[in-house]
């Protein structure tokens, strides 16, 4: 019980630091006049909102019996496994790195899909960029699903900036800010920012390319 409480306190402390870091980056961009005050305010609000939703989803999943705070397996007639595969496969890859097995990984000495779900669905493989990204975070000590998602949330900052810049090509400032707000409130986009998925990273890259 004491170890569990200690683990939760450490996770909470790291989560607070990560949220403050994200807002700190946004404030730095504002101070450097890279973004204006209105965009800084909107971006900070949504970082806070996404962080809160992430934490609520995590504890809801914990209370629903999902040990690691991620939804996976057969639930309400559907099978969920994307977060599961990213989470557990990155853990395996991180262990290989900690054991000094990088050379073996590069040689392909391990199975292409070492993690298999309970429904015999293979993982994404160790060549998957997002799996590698999560494994590196785990390698430096960021292991909880909440903290992994919060780190990933950093991509919302350039997403909001480039969406605003794209909107300003065609719209005035007020309408551009409304565009960013509406986009940020889309249910699907909220999920990509609050679950262990790579979709928000892909959207960010797409906006940068379009700009």
Functional labels for PLM-detected ranges:
Residues 2-65:
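Start-transfer (signal-anchor) and selected internal transmembrane alpha helices
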Residues 18, 122-125, 130, 134-142, ...:
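Transmembrane alpha-helices of multi-pass, membrane-embedded glycan-processing enzymes
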Residues 24-31, 150-170:
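Transmembrane-helix motifs of polytopic, lipid-linked glycan transferases
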Residues 47-48, 150-153, 181-185, 208-209:
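Residue-level signature of the transmembrane alpha-helical core
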Residues 53-99, 110:
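Aromatic-rich transmembrane-lumenal/periplasmic boundary elements in polytopic membrane proteins
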Residues 82-142:
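Short hydrophobic/aromatic helix or loop-helix immediately within or flanking a transmembrane segment
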Residues 142, 146, 160-185:
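Transmembrane-helix signature of polytopic, membrane-embedded enzymes
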Residues 176-193, 200-207:
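Membrane-embedded helix bundles of polyisoprenyl
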């Amino acid at each position: 019980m004491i170890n569990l409480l200690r683990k939760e306190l450490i996770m909470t402390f790291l989560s607070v630091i990560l949220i403050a870091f994200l807002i700190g980056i946004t404030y730095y961009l504002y101070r450097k006049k890279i973004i204006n005050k209105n965009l800084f305010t909107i971006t900070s609000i949504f970082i806070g909102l996404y962080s809160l939703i992430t934490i609520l989803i995590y504890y809801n999943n914990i209370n629903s019996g999902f040990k690691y705070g991620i939804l996976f397996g057969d639930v309400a007639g559907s099978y969920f496994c994307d977060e599961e595969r990213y989470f557990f496969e990155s853990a395996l890859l991180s262990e290989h790195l900690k054991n000094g097995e990088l050379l073996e990984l590069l040689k392909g000495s391990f199975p292409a899909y070492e993690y298999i779900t309970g429904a015999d669905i293979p993982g994404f493989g160790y060549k998957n960029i997002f799996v590698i990204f999560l494994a590196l975070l785990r390698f430096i000590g960021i292991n909880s699903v909440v903290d992994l998602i919060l780190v990933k949330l950093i991509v919302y900052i350039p997403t909001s900036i480039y969406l605003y810049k794209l909107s300003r090509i065609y719209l005035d400032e007020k309408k551009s800010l409304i565009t960013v707000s509406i986009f940020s409130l889309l249910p699907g986009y909220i999920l990509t920012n609050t679950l262990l998925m790579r979709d928000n990273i892909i959207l960010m890259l797409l906006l940068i390319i379009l700009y």
